[in-house]
Amino acid sequence: MNLLLSFVILAFGTAVFGLPLTSKRATICNGRAELCSRSYGNTTFLGSHNSYAVSTDIFAVGRNQEVSITAQLDLGVRFLQAQAHQWEGNLRFCHTSCILFDGGLVVDYLKKVKSWLDAHPNEVLTLLVTNPDNVSLRDVWKPAFDSSGVTPLTYVPPTNPMKRGDWPTLGSLIDSGKRVIVFMDSGADGAGVDFILPQFKMIWEPPFSSTDPNFPCSVDRNEGPLSVTDHMHMLNHNLNVNIIPIGDGVLVADRANAARTNSVSSIMANAGGCAPLAAGKAPNFVMLDWVNVGEGMKAVNMLNGFA
């Protein structure tokens, strides 16, 4: 009877969440004991927009951050967003053009992330990579993840897409060793690379590149078959300023007002504006420029129910 019970428990844990059961159990998850029993789909994470675009040069118009990837993670960022392009035969993190801002090789970026994860074994991290050139997942993206050592840490859900309410707990992800969730905006069809998940089938976004500090909310990008309320959602809480208001204009990240944009009051107002579209749920990801400025982590703690 005991053998049968053990078999049932093992099968249940593997089948429901796609996670192997281990004897250890995390007691602190993403810095909080309370988060160990919290579903990934019911947790809010601090995010970094164009996380690779790091510079303190005020004339670097393509910058969005001013502290390193490691420093961002040390500040509490657990959602890293980055856009990639094939340039000069290599996959590099760049936005629009690598001439405008070259964030370096994707594999080098991932190696930095892997080093940080190795030093912080009780952390769940999400990566959102955008793939406007539709670079091959199997031939280009997967080798970068493999070479960096990140692939063994990636989580593959038992169903794709996965409903917001069906995700495992942070504790389960950490205990399993599968604590990196990877989403991609375009080209993630699962063919041969099952750990790169289609973003818009599981996460919806409000409009991006906002120049309005009120961040009016609407469902701007998502895909079926899941309902909007079965999606997770993120806040594109990064403000832009039009520096050449002619034609389509030229938008750059608004550093001058970063403290106001990244304040608790601004973030909470944005979250409140999107909540009616998400069945009253808090956002899963709060994506900011200039994560070292303002009160991003304080707002995320509040959204997670911690005063």
Provide a role label for each language-model segment.
Residues 19-307:
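Catalytic cores of phosphodiester-bond hydrolases, prominently lipid phosphodiesterases
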